[in-house]
Regions:
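C-terminal and inter-domain tail/linker signature
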Residues: 2-140
Length: 140
């Protein structure tokens, strides 16, 4: 018989939210791309960018490109919600657009953007993520 244990579920959600915060802080804000292996499964799938990211090495390459284009990037988590093995975060990003990124030529201007990520955990690592980022600010 399966029983509902709200304490167990709450503790898992809290753990996943903690991992999500550490993931953003270490990978993006502290620029520790090699730490990705501590947060992501080897077959991570990151959906929502122009090109889908598949696998740990692709993810690290994608982050390196982001950090190259926006070297002073700082992400602040503004909201987070968790349910079972998923966490959603709403974030704000502040950066300077120093190098060409996607189809956007470098402007050398400071900007602020916002986005949402849904992170799906397998065990204690992120297996899949969906991201939606307001890229329109780069066209201004």
């Amino acid at each position: 018989m399966v029983t509902y244990d709200p304490y167990r579920i709450h503790m898992s959600e809290t753990k996943y939210k903690t991992v999500a915060r550490r993931f953003v802080e270490e990978i993006f804000n502290e620029r520790k791309t090699e730490a990705a292996k501590n947060f992501l499964t080897p077959d991570i799938a990151y959906h929502g960018m122009a090109e889908e990211v598949k696998g740990l090495e692709d993810f690290k390459k994608w982050v390196a490109e982001d950090l190259s284009a926006f070297p002073d990037m700082k992400i602040t988590i503004e909201d987070e919600f968790g349910e079972e093995n998923k966490v959603a975060i709403r974030w704000a990003l502040k950066a300077t657009h120093e190098k060409d990124f996607a189809d956007f030529p470098a402007t050398h201007k400071k900007f602020e953007s916002h986005g949402v990520e849904i992170l799906h955990f397998e065990g204690e690592k992120i297996k899949e993520a969906w991201t939606l980022t307001d890229m329109s600010v780069l066209a201004q």
